[in-house]
Amino acid sequence: MNANPKFLAATAEVDAAAVAPLPKSRKVYETGSRPDIRVPFREIEQADTPTMFGGEKNPPLTVYDTSGPYTDPQASIDIRRGLPALRRAWIEERGDTEVLDGPTSDYGKERLTDPKLTAMRFDLQRPPRRARAGANVTQMHYARRGIVTPEMEFIALRENLRREHYLETLRASGPDGEKLAKRLLRQHPGQSFGAALPSAITPEFVREEVARGRAIIPANINHPEIEPMIIGRNFLVKINANIGNSAVSSGIGEEVEKMTWAIRWGGDTVMDLSTGKHIHETREWIIRNSPVPIGTVPIYQALEKVDGKAEELTWEIFRDTLIEQAEQGVDYFTIHAGVRLPFIPMTADRMTGIVSRGGSIMAKWCLAHHKESFLYERFEEICEIMKAYDVSFSLGDGLRPGSGYDANDEAQFAELKTLGELTQVAWKHDVQVMIEGPGHVPMQMIKENMELQLKHCDEAPFYTLGPLTTDIAPGYDHITSGIGAALIGWYGTAMLCYVTPKEHLGLPNKKDVKDGIITYKIAAHAADLAKGHPGAAIRDNALSKARFEFRWDDQFNLGLDPDTAKEFHDETLPKDSMKVAHFCSMCGPHFCSMKITQDVRDYAAAQGVSEKDALQQGMQEKAVEFVKKGAEVYHRT
């Protein structure tokens, strides 16, 4: 169905599961140079090390937090009002925007005055903004003029993850604090493939990366609710979660719920890919309640306006859709301007043809009119709209391969070169750009994608869907793609678009969203570790220490999904007493490798020898015992 008939604005409620704090976690904030720069983090409490393992303190660990106010018990959440306008003062004080009387798009006006929509409409009292005549309000424009915005300072604090605070608490944790700090901050050298990864992120570094075009800050002036974040290969690898209704499934309430669920588990951005009848209203509810950037594919809604007939699309309809969505607050648009008429014949010999919805829409339009795409021909006009609201481009890969068979072919790379050319056009207008990538690519062919993207697109951030490394696993494509995502993230991709188990099969539900998010958080973190991102190993080291010390609850809570970890453990060892046991059900009490290792260490300490000598001594003792018992391999019992 197109909209849930039970959804009424007056009775809309937040998903209770999305607002509960994660186990042993609390929301903490770091304040910047001004009191309204308050950067949120999640702090995970840890138990002390048991006395038999040394009895030391384990300070709380800070992790990146995308959940916004939802997991803060001090926050009052009412999705009917939306989130606080965190950035309003920052936008207003720049003095380069004007408040409009109301929506200026034809469609926006039509929806606002339709009485049939009153019961489901979000009651936004705030009119939209637009750049003043002749002004440019993009973060890139400010960056290129040497301005460090509050958004940039916010991001610098956020990316550093309070590492200095953690170091100080480790050092102050006890007499061996310095030793503990050195141990827990240890990290293997990475291979960054040319990425520049400073030991600490400064606001000036953020400004430089945005000015250069190597990073983007998706932050529409009409989405003041967002907590600023950055996408770029010299920063933490980010992930995107796709949500959205269709003509046959889901409604407004479900999509808002999916959004809050996605950000709870780590979605850095969310794309609303709704294709049903109430796209406009669904998007408004999502944006007003989202602390993360929201992306869309405007051609989907434009197609709905012509009853799904691609050949009837016009520039005027598309332009009105861009303005409509920009005034709602969409932070980035996927626009398939690289699907050009000359490239379409290149897909003729493909196994799976054109699999991108946006790409196929534009290919059909080009063939129906035998004309160049209006997205390509009107690209500079699109840039004028983007810079009036600070909407970032996500230049779509409409010719991405839909199977390993089609990977790295002529059509894919012809489009990539065009996206590089369009990037230069957008940058001329100081419009922020990231480039979308494949798709389905076998592992040995992934690196070429990254290398060519850096070459053709002048290091603009790469944003990839996977890629899926094999085509044989419907129902498990979060895994087939997670493999490729980890690799391409290591090579330099800045943001990974998640794939859920339902990929190619159906619309994902809440469980699928979580499965996709966790899979891609693993891929992104693995990429950060492989690149050698400063501090990336801290959480791994803390969890490994907890595991060796049999601090079961800390193991669960330091992980990406505490609920599932605890559930799996409790299936066989459910009692509270088992949370302090020195074994799990995998090996049992007598064969736990970590317990055996600890026994060796205890023996070494008692004998006053090294662990190596203790092992050798133990082997000699067993050899003597073997000979005394007759040197028989087997004994009858």
Swiss-Prot record:
Its EC number is 4.1.99.17. The keyword Iron applies. Substrate binds at N242, M271, Y300, H336, S356, R357, G358, D397, G398, L399, R400, E436, Y463. InterPro entries: ThiC (IPR037509), ThiC-associated_dom (IPR025747), ThiC/Bza_core_dom (IPR038521), ThiC/BzaA/B (IPR002817). One of its GO terms (biological process) is thiamine biosynthetic process. Disulfide bonds: none annotated. Its cofactor is [4Fe-4S] cluster. Pathway: Cofactor biosynthesis; thiamine diphosphate biosynthesis. Binds 1 [4Fe-4S] cluster per subunit. The cluster is coordinated with 3 cysteines and an exchangeable S-adenosyl-L-methionine. [4Fe-4S] cluster binds at C584, C587, C592. Signal peptide: none annotated. Belongs to the ThiC family. Catalyzes the synthesis of the hydroxymethylpyrimidine phosphate (HMP-P) moiety of thiamine from aminoimidazole ribotide (AIR) in a radical S-adenosyl-L-methionine (SAM)-dependent reaction. Homodimer. This is Phosphomethylpyrimidine synthase. It comes from Bordetella parapertussis (strain 12822 / ATCC BAA-587 / NCTC 13253).
